[in-house]
């Protein structure tokens, strides 16, 4: 297997009409934005390309522009945003699992449930569970939830996972996401419904959004997925039949080089081979 190290987006931009770009780990690290990434995406758009930010954020996409702006990422870097929170909210609104839910996650995610017609209740009264992350992601991990999960699994409650990510960066620290809790719930015998990367439905919605933005459908061969998560961004792109550019300076940095900004090609290849995936290339950061 050969996975080239790409010098910049400009070297491959002509092959694509649209980019599905991850947010956390590519555009920012949770505390600071990467200005060169925003510049690269803006240049792609200036050449006629379309950029759809595809995020596993467990909140509506309407919340992200303000957050991105605070990190120095302006709207000039993208055309639109699609989040796993959008897909989760759409599903919850159907009331397929009922109208009474038990929420696991920080209070900042509560607006996910606005205008959905569902009611937050105690674990004992719930008809289903929604997980957006640990209650305190600075300190908690999945094992903190093993005991609380036991009665929920025993009752057969379905868990809706609004963010399939296992971990993300926050500054120089790794924190657990909803996907880590959902994985444990499944391992304990519980049923989980996932929304977001790497699961197929989010890519169908993304294709439809791209078609709306460009006025016509975009061929899969002309769509490039960009992300730092091998198990979400790169795996999801492969499952959807899309090319993927692997950003190694995010959560995989320690696995593929001694320095985040200088990936070792042999280690990148080994890391991807272990995952059974072959992105079209890799780069420490997305630059032009």
Features from the language model and the residues they span:
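Asp-based, Mg2+/Mn2+-dependent phosphohydrolase catalytic module
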Residues: 2-23, 28-47, 54-82, 86-288
